[in-house]
Amino acid sequence: MRLIIRPTYEDISKWAANHVAQKIKEFSPTREKPFILGLPTGSSPIGMYKNLIKLYKDEKISFQNVITFNMDEYIGIEKNHPESYHSFMWKNFFSHIDIKKENINILNGNALNLKKECEEYEKKIKSFGGIMLFVGGIGPDGHIAFNEPGSSLTSRTRIKTLTQDTIIANSRFFEGNVNKVPKSALTVGVGTIMDSQEILIIVNGHNKARALKHAIEKGVNHMWTISALQLHKNTIIVSDKKATYELKIGTVEYFNDIERENFNNDLK
């Protein structure tokens, strides 16, 4: 596991965007050989999306031959609801780039058969040979996607009941009203994410410091699903300084030392 520590949220957003863009460029995707990208929602990736949009507008990257799979979607709200993850992705990313609509995959939280929807999502990911790069964030309790504490670390895409902590945290998107937040969602599983060739996690803010400590310094534990990534062969966590405040000084110095030459990853 790699840990890239940068001073601010703006710095890690730029670093994450550059990393995603570089991976796509290195792959040189075509219509017959697309790049398969896993994407998150929430507040953590917004800065990354803004930077990716800028790279696209500066003609440094194209998404025409990129196929995306999103991590999750609420159950019971329409796609055009302002707080659905369909709406989030179109507002913050898809409508600003050249991605083809048919290349966008987001779980349908209103499918008639939700179990079948999850099974078909897994099959579609596998049909493309799996996710090449899965980008994500984490919650204060260490959850990744909607894999709440206690989730199986081998779980697949499924229906998941949200914890009260997650509902409260997400109420900021629903006028601060916890009663308006959906109580369940469809989510890729920890196992689904672990099958990806590479994982990039964005961590920012004081409230994520405890989760980052469990991700980096503690053992693998299903109560902190982010910790499963310790077992992945190619995971990068990019974190701002605030999120490192519970890490040991030695841990921070170690990663700063070995990653020093990777702090600047601007596209050539």
Swiss-Prot record:
Allosterically activated by N-acetylglucosamine 6-phosphate (GlcNAc6P). Keywords: Allosteric enzyme, Carbohydrate metabolism, Hydrolase. The record marks 151, 158, 160-161, 254 as: Part of the allosteric site. It catalyses: alpha-D-glucosamine 6-phosphate + H2O = beta-D-fructose 6-phosphate + NH4(+). One of its GO terms (biological process) is carbohydrate metabolic process. It comes from the Bacteria. Its EC number is 3.5.99.6. It holds the Pfam family Glucosamine_iso. SUPFAM superfamilies: NagB/RpiA/CoA transferase-like (SSF100950). Pathway: Amino-sugar metabolism; N-acetylneuraminate degradation; D-fructose 6-phosphate from N-acetylneuraminate: step 5/5. One of its GO terms (cellular component) is cytoplasm. The keyword Hydrolase applies. GO terms for molecular function: glucosamine-6-phosphate deaminase activity; identical protein binding. The active site is at residues 72, 141, 143, 148. InterPro entries: Glc/Gal-6P_isomerase, Glucosamine6P_isomerase, Glucosamine6P_isomerase_CS, NagB/RpiA_transferase-like. Catalyzes the reversible isomerization-deamination of glucosamine 6-phosphate (GlcN6P) to form fructose 6-phosphate (Fru6P) and ammonium ion. Belongs to the glucosamine/galactosamine-6-phosphate isomerase family. NagB subfamily. PANTHER family: GLUCOSAMINE-6-PHOSPHATE ISOMERASE. This is Glucosamine-6-phosphate deaminase. It comes from Borrelia garinii subsp. bavariensis (strain ATCC BAA-2496 / DSM 23469 / PBi) (Borreliella bavariensis). The gene is nagB.
